[in-house]
Amino acid sequence: MNEALQSAVITGPTGAVGLALCRELLHRGWQVYAVCRPGSARAGRLPQHPNLHKIDCDMSQAAMLPGLIPSGADAMFHLAWGHTMGEGRNDMLAQNENIRYTIEHIRAAAKLGCRVFVGAGSQAEYGRVEGLLQPGTPCFPENGYGMAKLCAGQMTRVEAEKLGMRHIWVRILSVYGPGDNENAMVPSLIRALLRGECPALTAGEQLWDYLYSADAAKALAELAIKGRSGGVYPLGSGRAVPLKEYVETLRDLICPGQPLGFGQRPYAPRQVMHLQADVSALRQDTGYAPATPFAEGAAQTIAWYQENP
């Protein structure tokens, strides 16, 4: 598959992946319809570009999108999802609503004339796995968030078949970059180090796969064009190193010599100790080759947080 696409709807455009995807598609010359929650405080982060059109529409109102985007679009990237952190991940009714909203968005995509739906899944669909995460790795999610993502991916795949659309489901691992959720590890650690604090940390022995947001965005764009319909693609760098090394890199970029509180916090219950994507299917179908070393992406992310305290 190598589909010619020129326009896209992006839900959830103000997070790390969404912002990077907006920039990537604009760089390719696409028309981008960035769907934001009305009154979103983060909408000001969106790139200022004549081909970017901000659409105010709550996630619960997907049926309104065809009327708000009368010109239609070629693709939809559905990144929006509620209750992604903390106790909200096990709010089962809220996660069930996320499933419904995802189904409503693929139906809206069909009415917009979209030929492909790219949905943002999660490594949480797998649960705890020792070894590489592959498209066919059995899924045993351990929280409502992962369960709902798995269900949404399966249900929208069936909807896509009924609607005559291509369907791509991307199980995103750990992406970092400008605009990331401030409660995620990389931004929370950056902010603490910029304040001169000594953050309390686990021992940092987890083997972890981090991917810079710009590389994730390129992968999503290429999957929309070339991805196999019905395909599931784990998305990471394909390389895992001890979490401690990432932390030390951030420290060395911000405040070399600053003490770090390794071992001051216990591991969480059901802590994932090995997170790593097998990107061979992604590479085979799209030519995927992440280009940003962690130190380089981290430096760009730190600069963004210094400009956006």
Model-identified regions with their sequence ranges:
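N-terminal Rossmann NAD(P)H-binding glycine-rich loop of SDR-like oxidoreductase domains
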Residues: A8-R28
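SDR active-site strand-loop-helix element
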Residues: T11, V35, M76-L79, F117-Q123, ...
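N-terminal Rossmann-fold cofactor-binding loop
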Residues: V35-S40, M59
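NAD(P)H-binding glycine-rich loop region in Rossmannoid oxidoreductase-like domains
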Residues: D56-E97
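Conserved Rossmann-fold NAD(P)-dependent oxidoreductase catalytic core, especially the SDR/UDP-sugar
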Residues: I103-G144
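NAD(P)-dependent short-chain dehydrogenase/reductase
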Residues: G131, Q154-W208, S213-K218, E222, ...
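Active-site helix of classical SDR
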Residues: G144, A148-C151
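C-terminal substrate-binding subdomain of Rossmann-fold SDR/epimerase-dehydratase oxidoreductases
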Residues: E197, L201-P309
